[in-house]
């Protein structure tokens, strides 16, 4: 983690708590509560660092695919707000793309797995819908990022990869 000593003590403590929750892969915790626990005057960097931590996989490489209170969805939510005020910061776009990529692939994989079980058809359909919605969000975010940063090879590579997995056949 980057040097965070310039952040307030409250910001540093909350980020340390977030790091432990992610490390321990706590998928029972409602990560939305972190927004409420944040200091009133939390800095933009604090919010970015929190979103960055939440969209980083824990040591066991487990995805938290919960749509309400899950690590990745909270990261996307935070980054979406940050991008409204700071659209010219490529790191914000990249971190949102990383989180959306995990979510889209995770829900797509879950949908495929559930579709193999006849008694799980309804759940498979729900997961397929989520995968399609998330993949469209991913592709749209990549399009917007490339419009802002047309020479950025990372965004172009991510778009090409996402297009392979979530191209027209996956459109909502």
Segments the model singles out, each with a brief description of its role:
Residues 74-81, 85, 89-91:
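Charged low-complexity stretches with an acidic bias
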Residues 31, 69, 76, 93, ...:
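Conserved positions within tetratricopeptide repeat
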Residues 36-37, 81-82, 118, 145:
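Canonical positions in the second alpha-helix
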Residues 1-2, 169-172:
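Short intrinsically disordered terminal tails
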Residues 4-20, 39-63, 88-128, 133, ...:
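Amphipathic alpha-helical repeat scaffolds of TPR domains
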Residues 18-32, 64-78, 130-137:
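Helix-turn-helix repeat elements of alpha-solenoid scaffolds
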């Amino acid at each position: 983690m980057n040097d965070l000593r310039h952040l307030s003590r409250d910001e540093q403590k909350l980020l340390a708590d977030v790091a432990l929750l992610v490390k321990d892969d706590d998928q029972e915790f409602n990560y939305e509560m972190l927004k409420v626990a944040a200091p009133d005057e939390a800095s933009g960097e604090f919010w970015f660092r929190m979103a960055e931590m939440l969209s980083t996989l824990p040591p066991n490489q487990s995805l938290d695919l919960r749509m309400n209170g899950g690590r990745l969805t909270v990261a996307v939510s935070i980054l979406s707000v940050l991008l409204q005020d700071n659209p010219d910061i490529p790191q914000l776009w990249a971190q949102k793309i990383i989180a959306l990529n995990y979510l889209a692939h995770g829900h797509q994989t879950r949908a495929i797995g559930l579709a193999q079980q006849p008694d799980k058809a309804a759940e498979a359909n729900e997961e397929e819908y989520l995968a399609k919605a998330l993949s469209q969000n991913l592709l749209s975010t990549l399009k917007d990022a490339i419009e802002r940063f047309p020479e950025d090879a990372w965004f172009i590579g991510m778009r090409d990869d996402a297009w392979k997995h979530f191209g027209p056949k996956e459109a909502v």
